[in-house]
A protein has these predicted regions:
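Glycine-rich, acidic and aromatic/proline-enriched surface loops and short helix-turn segments
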Residues: 40-55, 90, 136, 144-149, ...
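Short, well-structured active-site flanking segments
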Residues: 86-101, 187-192
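C-terminal motif of bacterial Sec signal peptides marking the signal peptidase cleavage site
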Residues: 15-18
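Sec-dependent signal peptide recognition
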Residues: 2-10
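Active-site SXXK
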Residues: 69-93, 118
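Flexible glycine/proline-enriched surface loops and loop-helix/loop-strand junctions
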Residues: 61-67, 111-112, 120-127, 155-162
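Mid-domain, small-residue-enriched loop/turn segments at the edges of structured enzyme/sensor domains
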Residues: 107, 114-115, 129-183
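Beta-lactamase-like hydrolase cores
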Residues: 21-66
Length: 192
């Protein structure tokens, strides 16, 4: 779990060029128009949102977009992984997730994968199986505990609600979740 959170937080580190800054409830929001260039280079509409914990500052090209809920998609691997580890479904990053031999959307998913590799290559069928093992009741219980809100699912959609349907989470809510997860991990490390 520590490896997963470390990868997530490392991927959020950037060098910033400040442009337009506003303050809201001691949180600073700084607009970075250069982020639009990054998105434009990939021909993608959206926003980039980065949080600097030391400066209590958010950086984005579009704060309205960043506060609007979207399907969590691949980012749901993070809470899904934490829940699986907490419940003992996954022991560690070397736990093997067996391929059932069925054809998958991507060839790279068509083999047994370590948990670490399944995370790295975003193996959707692996995470669908993990979600089924977690089950509806435990998934709801943990998401409520994490304050990971607006996930809409039942026993029929337990393995795809983060990919399709009406579940929504904003980039801002995602960062709030990661901040809480980091804090809780630090608290656990300090108590060990």
């Amino acid at each position: 779990m520590k490896n997963i959170l470390f990868v997530v937080f490392i991927s959020m580190i950037f060098l910033f060029v400040c442009c337009n800054t506003t303050t809201n409830k001691n949180i600073i929001e700084t607009e970075i128009s250069d982020f639009d260039k990054i998105l434009d280079s990939f021909q993608v509409n959206g926003s980039i949102l980065i949080y600097d914990n030391d400066k209590n500052t958010f950086y984005s090209n579009d704060f309205d977009w960043a506060k609007n809920g979207k399907l969590p998609a691949s980012t749901f691997k993070i809470p899904n992984s934490i829940i699986a580890v907490e419940l003992g479904i996954i022991e560690n990053d070397t736990t093997i997730l067996k391929w059932n031999g069925e054809q998958r959307k991507m060839d790279i998913w068509e083999k047994d994968l370590s948990f670490k590799d399944a995370f790295r290559i975003s193996c959707v069928p692996c995470y669908q199986e993990i979600a089924r093992k977690i089950g509806t009741i435990k998934m709801k219980e943990y998401l409520e505990k994490f304050e990971y809100k607006n996930m809409i699912f039942d026993s029929l959609t337990i393995d795809n609600f983060w990919l399709e349907g009406n579940s929504k989470i904003s980039q801002k809510q995602q960062i709030d979740f990661l901040r809480k997860a980091e804090f809780n991990l630090q608290m656990q490390q300090n108590s060990d």
